[in-house]
Amino acid sequence: MEIKKYNYIARYWKKIQSGEIEVCSKIYKTMEQLINIQSGNDDKYHFDPVLANRPIVFIENFCKQSKGNVGAALKLELFQKVILQAIYGIVDRKTHLRKYTEVFICIGRKNGKSTLLSALGNYGLLGDKEGGPEIDCVSTKRDAAKIVFNAARDMVKQSPYLRKYIKSRKSDLYCEYNLGVYQPLSSDSNTLDGLNPSMVILDECHAIKDRNLYDVMKQAMAAESRKQPLFITITTSGYNREGIYDELYDYASDVLEGRAEDEHFLSFIFELDSLEEWDDESKWIKANPGIGTIKSLPKLKENVERAKKTPDFKPTVLTKDFNLKNISASSWLSWEELNNEELFEADEVFDVCWTEYLTIGAKIRYRKIFDQINSIEAK
């Protein structure tokens, strides 16, 4: 099959520059980096349009929808094609191996993430030219890990081409053509030892409190036999603070801002830039790039209006639809509102040694010693 040399990264960037598509600051920085490579400004890596389009052609021709319009061709959105081209199309000029081996994607719910990952897993199993590929779809619980896996298996059932090469077994998908396997795994599996994944798919990492599962899978990808392993984490925001989600989010932010160097780490963080934007319909696309096509705009409008009238529902919308951090599912202040990192001098605030304030129902006592705040005591 002929591979067209479409450049979806450049097309997306053009729409961003013209204002046709609005993106958040983190996506803008990611796109700047990708365009810089495409422009030939990187001595080590370049954009290969044939390699970039291979997974897109595979998915749109051989992966069929397993929900809704069952059996119909799966057509990818522009932002999904951009993600795939960035992962598979930016390669080393000499070895032609992929630049990125770890990808972190944060996106609002109902933007097709499970469908994209399940199709990508099938590509990794059959279309990526990997010998003995091992696709491990992991989560904290096996039932959660099977969400993406079951979607992949249903795609195989709907596709005559995939059925020809991929067999559905009790606990996995098996490809006799290249001795490949696609399997769901979890931290409560009997063992995670002896794995040799060519691709790891970690879904909904916001729910992971213990980072052990992430660490085990990262270590499993260290085998010399895998020249370009791929670790993909995809998630919405969540309520667990200081977990692996926060760590990956902060690390991605550091890489984007230049505070950390990691040429093999790529992120696509779709989010609102500020809390105020949740009430502005024109900004919703920042966290929901599939709005109006994959995700229902009327339904999102309905949820936002309900959240305005129901305080307990508001954190769910802010966190899951717009990827704004919240402390808990029932919190009424967002992480953005609570997390004030502004610095100040004690002299500017306190004129006496002891000062008491009544703040949100709690008495806070501050003590000034040597021009610094020495202690904060909450009563």
Mark where each language-model region is.
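Phosphate/NTP-binding elements of NTP-utilizing enzymes
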Residues: 2-358, 366
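Metal-dependent catalytic core segments for phosphate chemistry
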Residues: 363-379
